[in-house]
Amino acid sequence: MAPVKKSDKKATLDAAAWMFNVVTSVGIIIVNKALMATYGFSFATTLTGLHFATTTLMTLVLRCLGYIQPSHLPFTELLKFILFANFSIVGMNVSLMWNSVGFYQIAKLSMIPVSCLLEVVFDKIRYSRDTKLSIGLVLVGVGVCTVTDVSVNTKGFVAAFVAVWSTALQQYYVHYLQRKYSLSSFNLLGHTAPAQAATLLIVGPFLDYWLTDKRVDMYDYNSVSVMFITLSCTIAIGTNLSQFICIGRFTAVSFQVLGHMKTILVLVMGFFFFDRDGLNLHVILGMIIAVLGMIWYGNASSKPGGKEKKNYSLPTTRQQKLGATSDSDEHRDKA
């Protein structure tokens, strides 16, 4: 049997990681929608804290089993990541409350240009014309799907601005920390999940009370709602892990662009399970445009020059000196 090429193996693992993220992300959205819309559990920030608490338990079990090796992440780096991640969660919840759904969706779409800017500034990434156009096509398609009424106010704009930048920075930082400190997805989750769980479970109940005027401890817990909360927390383990795996294997921009496939799947699943009137002609048209954009992005970014780091060449005289030095060293070694 012919040996498997390294590139083929990587492509298979990339596809598996991506499918893992899509399945868990769409699954948790459907479960959370049922939990909040049907059973009235509207405490989104506290629920996210429970998600990270469950993820923390998973990392502790994996560490005991030897699947997570000891690793180091400086406290300052952890603190910056937690600030970005928690501002992202809180900012998104506040933005949804203060803005129209249309402006909220536009804010989410603007994460792609912001992520591109971060990669250009910090990683010196250069995008080809086709890659830029394909990203634009995805934005247009998802915009047609999701953006309806668009109204904005000052405090809503500030909340959306904070949410977009903190989310983009958090996703960029996942990729950055894994590269800089040679951390696996499990290692990074082992460092970040406990801190996020602790902070969100402290802040969450107060923030949710401010947003909804309801107390999480006064919620009418029953066997069905507790089952949905448990299911949501269980799926969240896969969602959190797969996000770190995908951003580590790809980049924040690719994660955002291909991530809009989840938006389309959520719309389709929502049509079948919740809102029968939600899927109309302009939504279907937007889906088609977005999918074409994603296919174009995949082809454009994988081509030579589609997305690459800028190479800063040394001056000619400097290169010549280095070449001469290496030649003399080679002759000396031979002698």
From Swiss-Prot:
Disordered, as annotated region: 303-335
Highest taxon of source: Eukaryota
Compositionally skewed regions (Polar residues) per UniProt: 313-326
GO molecular function per UniProt: antiporter activity; transmembrane transporter activity
Membrane-spanning residues: 11-31, 41-61, 78-98, 102-122, 133-153, 157-177, 186-206, 227-247, 254-274, 278-298
InterPro entries found in the cross-reference section: Sugar_P_trans_dom, TPT_transporter
Membrane topology reported for the UniProt record: Multi-pass membrane protein
Subcellular location: Golgi apparatus membrane
PTM-bearing positions, type Phosphoserine: 326, 328
Keywords from the named record: Antiport, Golgi apparatus, Membrane, Phosphoprotein, Sugar transport, Transmembrane, Transmembrane helix, Transport
Assigned GO CC terms: Golgi apparatus; Golgi membrane; plasma membrane
One of the protein's GO biological processes: D-glucose transmembrane transport
Family statement drawn from the similarity comment of this UniProt entry: Belongs to the TPT transporter family. TPT (TC 2.A.7.9) subfamily.
Function: Nucleotide-sugar transporter that transports UDP-rhamnose or UDP-galactose and UMP in a strict counter-exchange mode.
Protein name per the record: UDP-rhamnose/UDP-galactose transporter 5
Species this protein is from: Arabidopsis thaliana (Mouse-ear cress)
